[in-house]
Amino acid sequence: MRIMARIGVENSLTDVQQALKQQGHEVVTLNSEQDAQGCDCCVVTGQDSNMMGIADASIKGSVITAHGLTTDDICQQVESRT
């Protein structure tokens, strides 16, 4: 059985949060840079390219910018990066 990832998702992306939870991932709402720690991957809106410092080296995983992507696109990117 595959171990699901811990995914940080910006709080305005509620549809993405729900979709990732349905896939079995642990979803953490990103309210501050500390919330991103321990996440395998983070999903941000892209409205602020360095949202709360998350786009820098504060996390070990990838940062996915949701701008222009559908919820399905984002979920596929999460699957390919975790």
UniProtKB/Swiss-Prot annotation:
Pfam families named among the record's database cross-references: UPF0180
Query: Which family does the record assign?
Result: Belongs to the UPF0180 family.
Protein name (database record): UPF0180 protein BALH_1248
